[in-house]
Amino acid sequence: MAGWAGAELSVLNPLRALWLLLAAAFLLALLLQLAPARLLPSCALFQDLIRYGKTKQSGSRRPAVCRAFDVPKRYFSHFYVVSVLWNGSLLWFLSQSLFLGAPFPSWLWALLRTLGVTQFQALGMESKASRIQGKKLALSTFLVLVFLWVHSLRRLFECFYVSVFSNTAIHVVQYCFGLVYYVLVGLTVLSQVPMNDKNVYALGKNLLLQARWFHILGMMMFFWSSAHQYKCHVILSNLRRNKKGVVIHCQHRIPFGDWFEYVSSANYLAELMIYISMAVTFGLHNVTWWLVVTYVFFSQALSAFFNHRFYKSTFVSYPKHRKAFLPFLF
């Protein structure tokens, strides 16, 4: 197996190690919540760091020192502002390199190398088959970065014009992590493009001719999942509006419709499906991106678990057939 293709399966670089560590941390947090109550950590800070919004309020009484580090949950919009600007810039650099042959900026190239990217190989040493594979991967990277930017832009729109935020809070550590998260995700996507020095492996003159079934399927899954997530957010928003669309309260109600008929956190399920659609776009065998998906799975599952417990403890009439995150399973 040649060059970067072989390295794809064998190297645990700093980027992969980071995603693996994040996934393991959220898996551990989830397992602790599923364990018997006597085994749960009593540390208020631990509980404060893994909860946000309504689930933070529904837990045990929080010490004043924890409340001092609260920031409004509506600051979620800041995450998407950062993502639109940062990942839009990365998309611009990638487009310039793919279609015009412009090299990446020195700082970006150095950052990718620091993260331990394995996609660097001298072009002259690659076979024709490897060059074709490189073009497919370049197209996958371009499409996934477009998906990430479109996703962030839609979520930013929803934060401003759809969502109705209550006065709940997130911890300042969660806020800082959210700001860094989309920067890291964008770099993870960009790191998958094959490069020779500061130039992208495959120029984009005939890039679209490299489209394969997984590119098309991934695109279809992305828009399908995004449409469901948007619908779920509209459903949640309408719980706090009257028929004219005017916000009348910020209380919590039981959501019905779309994937909410199956799970309590349908929007989190849609988020997972969006990331899986990106894994499909990468051809289903990109180890690095599957580590990202694994992190998303456990982080969303943890939040969904808290949501589900909140709904069940708050509403006596809550549908008993609903699961927390995965239909019919969990």
Swiss-Prot record:
Transmembrane segments: 17-37, 90-110, 137-157, 170-190, 207-227, 278-298
Regions of this protein lying in the Lumenal compartment: 38-89, 158-169, 228-277
Compartments where located: Endoplasmic reticulum membrane
Main location: endoplasmic reticulum
Keywords: Endoplasmic reticulum, Lipid metabolism, Membrane, NADP, Oxidoreductase, Transmembrane, Transmembrane helix
Coiled-coil residue spans: none
Catalytic activity: a di-trans,poly-cis-dolichal + NADP(+) = a di-trans,poly-cis-polyprenal + NADPH + H(+); a 3-oxo-5alpha-steroid + NADP(+) = a 3-oxo-Delta(4)-steroid + NADPH + H(+); androst-4-ene-3,17-dione + NADPH + H(+) = 5alpha-androstan-3,17-dione + NADP(+); 17beta-hydroxy-5alpha-androstan-3-one + NADP(+) = testosterone + NADPH + H(+)
InterPro entries documented for this protein: 3-oxo-5_a-steroid_4-DH_C, Dfg10/SRD5A3
EC numbers for this chain: 1.3.1.94, 1.3.1.22
Residue intervals annotated with topology Cytoplasmic: 1-16, 111-136, 191-206, 299-330
Alphabetized Pfam families for the sequence: Steroid_dh (PF02544)
Distribution of this protein across tissues and organs: Expressed in the 2 tissues tested i.e. testis and liver.
Enzyme class: oxidoreductase
Membrane topology term: Multi-pass membrane protein
Domain of life of the organism encoding this protein: Eukaryota
A GO CC term attached to the entry: endoplasmic reticulum membrane
Pathway: Protein modification; protein glycosylation
An example Gene Ontology biological process: dolichol-linked oligosaccharide biosynthetic process
Gene Ontology terms, MF aspect: 3-oxo-5-alpha-steroid 4-dehydrogenase (NADP+) activity; oxidoreductase activity, acting on the CH-CH group of donors, NAD or NADP as acceptor; polyprenal reductase activity; polyprenol reductase activity
PANTHER family, A to Z: DFG10 PROTEIN, POLYPRENOL REDUCTASE
Function: Plays a key role in early steps of protein N-linked glycosylation by being involved in the conversion of polyprenol into dolichol. Acts as a polyprenal reductase that mediates the reduction of polyprenal into dolichal in a NADP-dependent mechanism. Dolichols are required for the synthesis of dolichol-linked monosaccharides and the oligosaccharide precursor used for N-glycosylation. Also able to convert testosterone (T) into 5-alpha-dihydrotestosterone (DHT).
Family affiliation: Belongs to the steroid 5-alpha reductase family. Polyprenal reductase subfamily.
Name of this chain's protein: Polyprenal reductase
